Regions:
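Conserved active-site alpha-helix within GNAT-family acetyltransferase domains
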Residues: 109, 121-122, 132-149, 153-155
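Conserved beta-strand-loop-alpha-helix junction that forms the acyl-donor binding cleft
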Residues: 94-103, 127-136, 153-156, 164-165
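Single conserved hydrophobic/aromatic residue that forms the stacking wall/gate
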Residues: 1-16
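Conserved beta-hairpin
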Residues: 14-31
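Conserved GNAT acetyl-CoA-binding A-motif
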Residues: 90-91, 118-131
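Conserved acyl-donor/pantetheine-binding loop and adjacent beta-alpha core of acyl/acetyltransferases
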Residues: 27-97
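Conserved acetyl-CoA-binding loop-helix of GNAT-fold acetyltransferases
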Residues: 95-98, 104-117
Length: 166
């Protein structure tokens, strides 16, 4: 099934930002879809996450090609597909990034393990999207399944994944 990309008005949920250390070798941004928050906190968190996401995209690809594709595809490279899940007990991984120099050291796995443990303890599904096909198998190793793939006339695909509560 392919997720739809209709832009519906979305609720505001509690967002959390985690890092492996003060050096920010990795960051994980999650949204607890079961917990609503106030708008001021939401905009502060969103702004912080956007700035750091953009910084990671630029750092990972100095040619700015990936960053340019994200700007260009912003109207459909988003999480609106999660509306189809009809699941309020859900964590959504908004962003997971590891500094390229620190990759392959288990940092992402540690952050994911902690997220999965939290979700299991709270009987929650986890959803996420990735734009890197190589990441799909990585997430499958943690029990995620491809829910759908968003494609347009555009060189970037969005792989939508879920991990059911088990």
């Amino acid at each position: 099934s392919t997720p739809s990309n209709s832009s519906a008005a979305s609720d505001v949920y509690k967002r959390q930002i985690f890092a492996d250390s003060e050096e920010l070798n990795s960051i994980l941004v999650v949204s607890d879809e079961a917990e609503h928050i106030n708008m001021f906190h939401f905009f502060l968190t969103e702004s912080w996450a956007t700035i750091h996401t953009d910084a990671f995209l630029i750092k990972e690809d100095p040619t700015l090609a990936t960053f340019h594709n994200f700007i260009k595809g912003g109207d459909y490279l988003n999480s609106s597909w999660t509306d189809q899940l009809h699941q309020t007990q859900r964590l959504h991984i908004i962003y997971l990034a590891v500094d390229p120099e620190m990759q392959h050291h288990g940092i992402a796995a540690k952050l994911l393990d902690e997220t999965i443990t939290y979700a299991q303890e709270h009987h929650m599904m986890i959803s996420l999207e990735t734009h890197n096909e190589k990441n799909v198998d990585f997430y499958k190793n943690f029990g995620f399944q491809v829910y759908g793939i968003v494609e347009k006339n555009f060189p970037l695909k969005q792989y939508c994944l879920i991990r059911e509560y088990q």
